[in-house]
Amino acid sequence: MLAIAMIRCWYDYWRERPGTGRRVSSGGAKIIFSDTNTHHRGEENYRRSGVTDPMRIEKDAFFAHQVMWNGWVDTEEDNTYIIGHWNYPANTVKPVYVVSTGEEVELFLNSQSLGKGKREYNFLFTFDNVAFKAGKLEAVSYNKAGKEISRYAVSTVGEPAGLKLTTIQNPEGFHADGADLALI
């Protein structure tokens, strides 16, 4: 998973950050500068990986980055994020990854504790062999004293009931001039 690979890379920058009290790093710049009409690259130059998709819709790595790099030099706000969704076929067993600023993270499935995760790279907590069961998957983070500092939950979605498309347009409306774009 891309988000997990990025956490491992970002941790190296986070661990080695100078403690000057000033922002010394962007936490990893997420921009690529290039001339898209050079060397026959064209539109294929746009990256398919990263923290957002081409329409700037956030991916898991975006939220992992927010947990890790939410302050200046040190983390200022505690936060927790479960990587991925909780919608799987019956009998699925998989690892669950949680990004957290806490010292410990406990995972709950439908209010039943699944135990505490294995900590890696200071922010990444792994829960191996979690059996899928429809409902609410919740991660609760604790500080050194065992006090809850943050939580995050994902839930299984039900069957779709319908689809509603809503346009967002500029004040002048849509124009069939070849310049407007509708994403569906």
Task: Please annotate each region the language model reported.
Residues M1-Y121, F125-E148:
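Extended substrate-binding grooves/exosites of carbohydrate-active enzymes
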Residues W86-T92, P171-D180:
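Short, solvent-exposed loop/linker segments at the N-terminal edge
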Residues E138, S150-Y152, P171:
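Non-catalytic terminal accessory/regulatory regions of metabolic enzymes
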Residues A145-G158:
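Edge beta-strands of extracellular beta-sandwich domains
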Residues V98, D177-I184:
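Beta-strand-rich structural segments
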Residues R15-E16, N170-E172:
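Short beta-turn/strand-loop junction motif enriched in small, turn-promoting residues
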Residues A161-L163:
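Proline-centered linker/hinge motifs at extracellular inter-domain junctions
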Residues I82-H85, L165-P171:
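Surface-exposed, proline-enriched loop/turn segments that connect beta strands in immunoglobulin-like
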